[in-house]
Structures are given as structure tokens and as C-alpha cells.
Amino acid sequence: MEWKTCNFCGKSIEPGTGKKFVKKDGSVMFICSSKCEKNYKLKRVARKLRWTPIYYNNKHSNKK
């Protein structure tokens, strides 16, 4: 089994956990938790949320 990464926050998802979310256009998103799912449905941007690893990656890369 292969590990997936959450398309919202960027965390790795252990096999057998998480959700597969299929959009209307047929693209597939892997979601690690209900927290990520709710924020995605509210159309929030992960780069602006402090609890996501993507926020910290962008924050530190902009300082260089």
C-alpha cells in the first residue's frame, strides 16, 4: 500500500485512513481529516491557515 498526501494541508495519509473526494470535473482529492474537508468545502486557502504545513513552508521560503 502506498501513502498519499492530503491535497489540502500536505500531510501524509496512512493507508486505510482519510477520504477520497471526487470533484464534479472528475479530479480526485485525498483528504486526511474532517478538519481539512470542512475547510476545503468552505473554500479556504491552506496557505493562509497557520495550522497547515503548507503555511509554514511558504512562510519560510519567502524569507530567503
From Swiss-Prot:
Belongs to the eukaryotic ribosomal protein eL24 family. GO terms for biological process: translation. A zinc finger (C4-type) spans 6-36. GO terms for molecular function: rRNA binding; structural constituent of ribosome; zinc ion binding. GO terms for cellular component: ribonucleoprotein complex; ribosome. The lineage of its organism: Archaea, Methanobacteriati, Methanobacteriota, Methanomada group, Methanococci. The keyword Electron transport does not apply. Its cofactor is Zn(2+). This is Large ribosomal subunit protein eL24. Zn(2+) binds at C6, C9, C32, C36. Pfam families: Ribosomal_L24e. Part of the 50S ribosomal subunit. Forms a cluster with proteins L3 and L14. NCBIfam families: PRK14891.1-1 (NF034186). InterPro entries: L24e/L24_sf (IPR038630), Ribosomal_eL24 (IPR056366), Ribosomal_eL24-rel_arc (IPR055345), Ribosomal_eL24-rel_N (IPR000988), Ribosomal_eL24_CS (IPR023442), TRASH_dom (IPR011017). It comes from Methanococcus aeolicus (strain ATCC BAA-1280 / DSM 17508 / OCM 812 / Nankai-3). Binds 1 zinc ion per subunit. Keywords: Metal-binding, Ribonucleoprotein, Ribosomal protein, RNA-binding, rRNA-binding, Zinc, Zinc-finger. SMART domains: TRASH (SM00746). Binds to the 23S rRNA.
